């Protein structure tokens, strides 16, 4: 319903991804490092829940304890979906979507990954937080997660 789902909005975000060597060559100061990503699928009938599985898969792949990560941005297509993912991962609510998710700030279709990446980048840059994970639900019962660390 309109009260618990994200609205469709215009919006944009951009990210530039390059190797450390290329950044040095261009004189660009890296802000974050992509440590890894994972994709998982689940029953498409349970829309939006697969980020739980992609986040667990990524944490296992990298040997990272989810509870030790400083912040999370979870795509909030629906309040119940984002809440269920966060709850079932056992995440501290104070670390999840700390400036609001898709319901409060909108959900421009096709910009989710870049927007979540930019949100965590700015939070890592302005605080002493060291790492972040983003995740989103994608079509057909899939989820994708990416883990970043701050470049010092």
Residues covered by each model-derived region:
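Claisen-condensing/thiolase-fold acyl-transfer catalytic domains that form or cleave C-C bonds
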Residues: 1-152
């Amino acid at each position: 319903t309109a009260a618990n789902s994200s609205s469709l909005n215009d919006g944009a975000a951009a990210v530039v991804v390059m190797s450390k060597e290329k950044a040095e060559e261009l004189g660009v100061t890296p802000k974050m490092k992509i440590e890894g990503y994972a994709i998982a699928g689940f029953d498409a009938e349970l829309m939006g829940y697969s980020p739980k599985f992609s986040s667990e898969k990524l944490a296992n792949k990298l040997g990272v304890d989810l509870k030790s990560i400083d912040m999370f941005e979870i795509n909030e297509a629906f309040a119940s979906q984002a809440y269920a993912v966060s709850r079932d991962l056992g995440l501290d609510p104070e670390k999840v979507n700390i400036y609001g998710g898709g319901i409060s700030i909108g959900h421009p279709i096709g910009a989710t990954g870049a927007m979540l990446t930019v949100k965590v980048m700015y939070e890592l840059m302005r605080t002493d937080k060291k790492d972040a994970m983003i995740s989103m639900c994608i079509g057909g019962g899939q989820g994708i997660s990416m883990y970043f660390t701050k470049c010092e």
